């Protein structure tokens, strides 16, 4: 009550912000005539002037009015588009690091140019993030003439681009790309072994288009770079035969082997189900007699069984995935797009492959990962645009510290949003949908039908075919035709059936998108220039008449075939109609068989329906029901927010560790001299080893000197008789032992360094350190995954799972860091270097490395290169081909036991002959 009174007196926070922005708009508008009077050359010179003013200490905020005025005028000259006042407000919202909520058709792509131009002047790079490669390329192509006119360069990052091209794209002033590509490049940059292989610059400023889709819908999906792990493919096939033998129970307390919690998206085995599954697995020979699935040795079996059950009960073809070219391709539940290249983790993808009888690919092991939540929080400044952010404003504020500002439309919205119509069954609902479409088609009103799955879009398409109604289907299977279909969805009588329209990125223009049609004519090579011009002229003449006819028919009519879990997705579908003051309408058709109504058991609504509409095919519509349904959606949104927040809380633990590892890795990559760091590592490792077997403040009787000597010999090739030291000097203690051992190791290491040269040794050290860190980090990520999967069980012991996870993760990270230091010290101190008897030191200083030996069986694995590879690199820096074929072509005859012609000193069969 008091809040409402205060809002009436002082206005809302949004109103106050808009008031401030309008003052700046007035200053920008005051400069318009001045900018229009400038020649092209003078207008272009403004960019250099702004850069100089920034270099002289002026701030971006200080030059904002002039920069926005310049960008607006340049846009008018190059693109033929002038920014409206509300678009100027949107640009300022983005510059301030906030989210601009702008309705569909309000020109978000043009709005971004203002903030992008201003921030690009700082020379630190600006990233414009879109949801797919098509939109990234399209938006960059549309806006490049504007940016180039203003003296700025534009790059585009798309999948399958080579590293060199990526470096060039990131070096541009403005870089367009998808959230996936930006995130994966960040991870790949933190896996390189040479700093010059990195592609990204510092993460400065990002403008995220469809920000709700990227930062909320995809927040639960981490970006993962992975490699194939050892996996038993046959086990997935065998486990696939088990679910059909188990009985599904209707409720948690019912009779059967398992029940499905659709709300939580989980499958739970009952006690009887465990026993039944154990019997089946015992008969198959996978489980020993009287053994349990709960025993530690059978965790893998349990893992595969639950994956198979989830694949059979929770994941459905043409809803959650499609089969394309013999592969399982995931369908994005929010947009209906195919997510090629994405795979479910924890063996689920393999279980679905087994269910569908396609080739099963090995499960992957995580090499590097990050969530979008943590990736985008790395930017110095982050902003976003969307048509629907207000419903998620709290989440944007609490997780990303992003305030949402609702930008008023340039023209009032005239769309009519009718109440939902609710039917008993899905069959009755779809009959009503077809009837509504038929009526619209008769009066020439275009219709967009939104469905939540590919299965439903194909069902609607089938019903329309039976009714003889021509239509287009737009779902994940028709991805390539997507933009063309959407562009023409506003033509007279057009019927378009589409899975969720979120993120489609193309405006529906009443009367059809004239530009798309004229572009298609211009691209038709079969037509002469005269024919093209004639067709374009005829098209332009007829377009206005068609546009007027659609306006008279009521504009675009939106039909939703069911409510989505998120109100935001429903609003995005509705928002396709009524763009820029156009007329339009929307209505949702629901049934009590729809997942949302079924799962949230709207008993009261069902009772009302039975009382008010007893006849078949009769629907009810009432504000009370609509509010109840929105209440159910709020429950789901709240639950999903809690899940995303929980993912973030757990990932924040790994994120802090990731920052430490990546920071250390970067320091190693960029430091010219790492000798001090190496010395510190050797000292720490020796000290820890001595403390382990000679604990500080302990009695001499508690010391384990023989084991210490054995460890030093095995791990560091250090053969020291410590026991004789102790006999010779009774006063000696652990600290003295440490100092002597460190001195011996340092002397030996200095001798090796002198033998091969300081730079060669530094390069070798750097390579070893990076390989060790990467391998140890990879194993640590796997261990963290296992910890995360089972940590919820701690709650049964009255412990807080999150606190337990943090505590154990911290201990594991300490062990990881100690393990990294130990492996680095062990590998580098145990390496033996022999002087090359052939090569002349003065001529080939790097040639001193002849061969590298190590007692450690992990040497080759940890280095990632064999001894031969390292020697070959050293003696063949220009990549000369010494294969038998190449030597024969050059007229050289080299036998297997002859010295390798590369100069390594090794026999040919042990060097390039081995590689061949």
From Swiss-Prot:
It catalyses: ATP + H2O + cellular proteinSide 1 = ADP + phosphate + cellular proteinSide 2. Zn(2+) binds at residues 900, 902, 911-912. One of its GO terms (biological process) is intracellular protein transmembrane transport. GO terms for molecular function: ATP binding; metal ion binding; protein-exporting ATPase activity. Pfam families: P-loop_SecA, SEC-C, SecA_DEAD, SecA_PP_bind, SecA_SW. Its EC number is 7.4.2.8. Keywords: ATP-binding, Cell inner membrane, Cell membrane, Cytoplasm, Membrane, Metal-binding, Nucleotide-binding, Protein transport, Translocase, Translocation, Transport, Zinc. Transmembrane segments: none annotated. The keyword Protein transport applies. ATP binds at residues 87, 105-109, 507. Gene3D superfamilies: Helical scaffold and wing domains of SecA, P-loop containing nucleotide triphosphate hydrolases, SecA, preprotein cross-linking domain. Its cofactor is Zn(2+). It is found in: Cell inner membrane; Cytoplasm. It is a peripheral membrane protein. SUPFAM superfamilies: Helical scaffold and wing domains of SecA (SSF81886), P-loop containing nucleoside triphosphate hydrolases (SSF52540), Pre-protein crosslinking domain of SecA (SSF81767). May bind 1 zinc ion per subunit. GO terms for cellular component: cell envelope Sec protein transport complex; cytosol; plasma membrane. It is an enzyme of class 7 (translocase). Part of the Sec protein translocase complex. Interacts with the SecYEG preprotein conducting channel. Has a central role in coupling the hydrolysis of ATP to the transfer of proteins into and across the cell membrane, serving both as a receptor for the preprotein-SecB complex and as an ATP-driven molecular motor driving the stepwise translocation of polypeptide chains across the membrane. Belongs to the SecA family. Monomer and homodimer. Part of the essential Sec protein translocation apparatus which comprises SecA, SecYEG and auxiliary proteins SecDF-YajC and YidC. This is Protein translocase subunit SecA. The gene is secA.
